[in-house]
């Protein structure tokens, strides 16, 4: 699988439910049901991605469980516990030109308004008020920083996002 075809992880398979191979689902989508909008899924089993189809799913108390094609026993389901669930990037909804997915920001250089290279976006954290970029500082950072946290607030701290050029322009003090 080429790097631009690497699956986008949307969740993971949890523990078994019952004796007929059903599995609990942990979804990373905005709503739990959102993960079922995509078909087929890719499951990462023993380090390899393989295609699988969801036959049916339902709420079971507060959990969501699913029946997967080819998984008909508890023993087989146990082998899939904790496997990642992914989809191909082209299965994701197309976005307007000025929007992007979080995954598109990972690896972007973060430059402030004075031209200082603050580092590379390593991950994004969702907080109650706004998302936060966790920026891994360059090895020889002038301010001795290892990591920076930059609030993702467009127009205030985030001035420009260039997904194609892998750069984010920020109004942020590099010593903060």
From Swiss-Prot:
InterPro entries: PRC_barrel-like_sf, PRC_RimM, RimM, RimM_N, RimM_N_sf, Transl_B-barrel_sf
Pfam families: PRC_RimM, RimM
Molecular function per GO: ribosome binding
GO cellular component terms listed in the entry, alphabetical order: cytosol; ribosome
Predominant subcellular localization, coarse grouping: cytoplasm
Domain called PRC barrel: residue spans: 97-176
GO biological process: maturation of SSU-rRNA
Origin superkingdom: Bacteria
Keywords, alphabetical: Chaperone, Cytoplasm, Ribosome biogenesis, rRNA processing
Subcellular location field: Cytoplasm
Gene3D superfamilies per record: PRC-barrel domain, RimM
Function statement: An accessory protein needed during the final step in the assembly of 30S ribosomal subunit, possibly for assembly of the head region. Essential for efficient processing of 16S rRNA. May be needed both before and after RbfA during the maturation of 16S rRNA. It has affinity for free ribosomal 30S subunits but not for 70S ribosomes.
Known partners and oligomeric status: Binds ribosomal protein uS19.
Domain writeup: The PRC barrel domain binds ribosomal protein uS19.
NCBIfam families xrefs: 16S_RimM
Family assignment from sequence similarity: Belongs to the RimM family.
Name assigned to this protein: Ribosome maturation factor RimM
Organism of derivation: Shewanella oneidensis (strain ATCC 700550 / JCM 31522 / CIP 106686 / LMG 19005 / NCIMB 14063 / MR-1)
The gene coding this protein: rimM
